[in-house]
Amino acid sequence: MAVPARKTSKAKKRLRRTHQTVVKPEISFDEANGDYRRSHHVSLKGYYNGKKVIKGASK
């Protein structure tokens, strides 16, 4: 079985783990239709930047 030659320091462990964070999605209020949506994404009703971009979106 493989055994590490040296103890991994706290700094090395933490540097390696910096990429394992959970990212909170950016949510903004869309005043055009009164819904919340993710930034730079189409709303659930099919609007983006105040214009209808998806024809068959729900409601």
Swiss-Prot record:
GO annotations of cellular component type: large ribosomal subunit
Ribonucleoprotein among keywords: yes
Record carries keyword Ribosomal protein: yes
Cross-referenced Pfam families: Ribosomal_L32p (PF01783)
A GO MF label: structural constituent of ribosome
Keywords, alphabetical: Ribonucleoprotein, Ribosomal protein
UniProt-listed GO biological process terms: translation
Highest taxon of source: Bacteria
HAMAP family for the chain: Ribosomal_bL32 (MF_00340)
Family: Belongs to the bacterial ribosomal protein bL32 family.
Protein name: Large ribosomal subunit protein bL32B
